[in-house]
């Protein structure tokens, strides 16, 4: 897709009155339309790191149960792969159970400081246990005890008992064995949208959709 954006703002900067970002956020890809969205994702994350976005990899991930009822939570993107983004969880958690029955998921990265967001849609695939072993050992060892004793998303009946169990494991120091349910998913992307706060409320939206031959890219109206 080719094209260019012409013309000048009529009313000065004219940014959205409903967003509170204070940092300039360059969006050169809106002009050049790169063929590969993963390169755009890498560029945005690197720029976010450089300008000091506090949690650039905090992804609001939405899944749905067998009846189509959605649920959302924040997960941390640990890796950008060729096919999508990687995150860790527990297989017995609500998201783990939902992804087992319905692998389709959608996530949003929102950066308040720059008034930017990235929407990621695709199918979540559980990766081999070797990948989970590696991810577990990369976590700070201080997180191992509670992650080992917790049965994520199950009812908590005795707070102190769980705390005591985690403290006992912490006395062992060093890494603990990976819990059986600790796993890693790759959200293999079928579409991405990069959103920037444009001038005169003409927000800059760049949409990528996977096709049989690669990616289709287009600008969207605000």
UniProtKB/Swiss-Prot annotation:
Q: Which UniProt keywords apply?
A: Antibiotic biosynthesis, Flavoprotein, FMN, Oxidoreductase, Virulence
> Entry's InterPro entries?
Phenazine_biosynth_oxidase, Pyridox_Oxase, Pyridox_Oxase_CS, Pyridox_Oxase_N, Pyridoxamine_oxidase_dimer_C, Split_barrel_FMN-bd
Q: Which Pfam families match?
A: PNP_phzG_C, PNPOx_N
Instruction: Give the EC number(s) under which this enzyme is classified.
Output: 1.10.3.16
Alphabetical list of PANTHER family matching this protein? PYRIDOXINE-5'-PHOSPHATE OXIDASE (PTHR10851:SF0), PYRIDOXINE-5-PHOSPHATE OXIDASE (PTHR10851)
**Cofactor(s) the protein needs:** FMN
Q: What does this protein do?
A: Involved in the biosynthesis of the antibiotic phenazine, a nitrogen-containing heterocyclic molecule having important roles in virulence, competition and biological control. Catalyzes several oxidations in the terminal steps of core phenazine biosynthesis. It oxidizes both hexahydrophenazine-1,6-dicarboxylic acid (HHPDC) and tetrahydrophenazine-1-carboxylic acid (THPCA) and thereby contributes to the generation of both phenazine-1,6-dicarboxylic acid (PDC) and phenazine-1-carboxylic acid (PCA). It synthesizes phenazines in their reduced form, which are the likely end products in vivo.
Q: Which reaction does it catalyse?
A: (1R,6R)-1,4,5,5a,6,9-hexahydrophenazine-1,6-dicarboxylate + O2 = (1R,10aS)-1,4,10,10a-tetrahydrophenazine-1,6-dicarboxylate + H2O2; (1R,10aS)-1,4,10,10a-tetrahydrophenazine-1,6-dicarboxylate + O2 = (5aS)-5,5a-dihydrophenazine-1,6-dicarboxylate + H2O2; (1R,10aS)-1,4,10,10a-tetrahydrophenazine-1-carboxylate + O2 = (10aS)-10,10a-dihydrophenazine-1-carboxylate + H2O2; (1R)-1,4,5,10-tetrahydrophenazine-1-carboxylate + O2 = (10aS)-10,10a-dihydrophenazine-1-carboxylate + H2O2
Per the UniProt entry, what species is this protein from, by scientific name? Pseudomonas fluorescens
Its protein name is Dihydrophenazinedicarboxylate synthase
Q: In which pathway does it act?
A: Antibiotic biosynthesis; phenazine biosynthesis
Gene3D superfamilies xref list? Electron Transport, Fmn-binding Protein, Chain A
């Amino acid at each position: 897709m080719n094209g260019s954006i012409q013309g000048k703002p009529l009313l000065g900067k004219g940014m959205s009155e409903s967003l509170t970002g204070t940092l300039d956020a360059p969006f050169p890809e809106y002009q050049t339309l790169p063929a590969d969205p993963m390169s755009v994702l890498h560029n945005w994350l690197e720029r976010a790191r450089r300008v000091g976005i506090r949690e650039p990899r905090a992804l609001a991930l939405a899944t749905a149960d067998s009846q189509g009822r959605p649920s959302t939570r924040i997960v941390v993107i640990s890796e950008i792969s060729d096919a999508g983004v990687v995150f860790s969880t527990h297989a017995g958690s609500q998201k783990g159970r939902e992804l087992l029955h319905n692998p389709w998921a959608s996530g949003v990265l929102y950066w308040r400081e720059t008034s930017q967001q990235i929407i990621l849609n695709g199918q979540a695939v559980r990766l081999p246990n070797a990948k989970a072993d590696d991810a577990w050992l990369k976590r700070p060892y201080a997180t191992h005890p509670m992650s080992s004793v917790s049965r994520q998303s199950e009812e908590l009946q005795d707070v102190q008992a769980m705390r005591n169990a985690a403290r006992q494991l912490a006395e062992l120091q060093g890494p603990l064995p990976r819990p059986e349910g600790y796993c890693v998913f790759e959200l293999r992307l079928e579409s991405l949208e990069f959103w920037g706060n444009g001038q005169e409320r003409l927000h800059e939206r760049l949409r990528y959709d996977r096709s049989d031959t690669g990616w289709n890219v287009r600008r969207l109206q605000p």
